[in-house]
């Protein structure tokens, strides 16, 4: 193990950045930013856009750092996560706690200063939901950890909407519901091809507790529900034909993956489905944004 003194500043920075799970944070912040733009017919005020993005990013990073701290022993037993600096003992517990506290404090101040108190408190509640309720309580105790804990991970669009309007109306909750229903099939395909990792770590993920066949069926069922839920922005009048077409096409591909996994499973297929699920959510929310600004131009 390298000592702190022997590490370059760049290496140290990379280690701290790894604690924030940058790729996961990017997707969460992206969905929050989409929520900001959908909340207004025009341009999001710059101070809200920048302040909201930075504040949500910092608090999300703080939550992920706590997750890495709590799960460092578990991460060390799993091939997918053994590389993390927390799992390798390259960053100490006090250092992670201080890092998370700084990120969280600066993030909360940024949201309070540049957006509004509601956004700050909702983001703090999301932090608690992920770092405490999901990480400490749900994940090690129940195979429904992803289903219940998915509520905190689904909040970014509502946070973005609140940052602009100071409220969270029904349309924002539709976006939250989409991510909430997307979360189980997204994580269960990962848990399928990483089942041995979770089994060795003693985590009660669905494939470990209920078996592969049961999990494959539930991936299909949740993907069908997701397909239906993604039609709600069009049904409610929030979005138009551009979004509807995108949602149907993207959802059809996701359904095809879920059906193949249910009928003829392979680890390689599950890997492809997992990667696609990330692309799916990104493109779905991008379609919401394009539709939002295209509708006035198209007169629909």
From Swiss-Prot:
The record lists the catalysed reaction(s) as:
heme b + (2E,6E)-farnesyl diphosphate + H2O = Fe(II)-heme o + diphosphate
Give, as in the UniProt entry, the pathway in which the protein acts: Porphyrin-containing compound metabolism; heme O biosynthesis; heme O from protoheme: step 1/1
**UniProt enzyme class:** transferase
Q: Name one GO biological process term.
A: heme O biosynthetic process
Keywords tagged on the record: Cell inner membrane, Cell membrane, Heme biosynthesis, Membrane, Transferase, Transmembrane, Transmembrane helix
GO (cellular component) term, any one: plasma membrane
Question: Could you tell me which Pfam families the record lists for this protein?
Answer: UbiA
Q: Does the keyword Metal-binding apply?
A: no
Cross-referenced PANTHER family: 4-HYDROXYBENZOATE SOLANESYLTRANSFERASE, PROTOHEME IX FARNESYLTRANSFERASE, MITOCHONDRIAL
The entry's protein name is Protoheme IX farnesyltransferase
């Amino acid at each position: 193990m390298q000592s702190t003194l022997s590490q370059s500043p760049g290496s140290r920075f990379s280690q701290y950045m790894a604690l924030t799970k940058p790729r996961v944070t990017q997707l969460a912040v992206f969905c929050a930013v989409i929520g900001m733009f959908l909340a207004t017919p025009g341009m999001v005020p710059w101070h809200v856009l920048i302040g909201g993005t930075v504040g949500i990013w910092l608090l999300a990073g703080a939550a992920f750092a706590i997750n890495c701290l709590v799960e460092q022993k578990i991460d060390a037993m799993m091939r997918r996560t053994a590389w993390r600096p927390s799992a390798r003992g390259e960053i100490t517990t006090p250092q992670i706690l201080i890092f998370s506290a700084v990120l969280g404090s600066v993030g909360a101040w940024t949201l309070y200063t540049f957006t509004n108190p509601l956004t700050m408190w909702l983001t703090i509640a999301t932090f608690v939901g992920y770092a405490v309720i999901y990480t400490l309580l749900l994940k090690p105790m129940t195979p429904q950890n992803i289903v219940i804990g998915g509520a905190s991970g689904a909040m970014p669009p509502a946070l973005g909407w609140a940052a602009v309007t100071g409220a969270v109306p029904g349309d924002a909750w539709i976006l939250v519901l989409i991510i909430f229903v997307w979360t189980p099939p997204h994580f269960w395909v990962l848990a399928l091809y990483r089942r041995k990792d979770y089994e060795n770590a003693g985590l009660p993920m669905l494939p470990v507790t209920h078996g592969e066949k049961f999990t494959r069926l539930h991936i299909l069922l949740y993907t069908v529900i997701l397909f239906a839920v993604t039609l709600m922005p069009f049904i409610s009048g929030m979005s138009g034909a551009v979004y509807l077409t995108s949602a149907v096409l993207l959802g059809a591909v996701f359904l095809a993956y879920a059906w193949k996994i249910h009928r003829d499973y392979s680890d390689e297929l599950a890997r492809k489905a997992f990667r696609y699920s990330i692309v799916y959510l990104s493109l779905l929310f991008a379609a919401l944004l394009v539709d939002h600004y295209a509708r006035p131009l198209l007169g629909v």
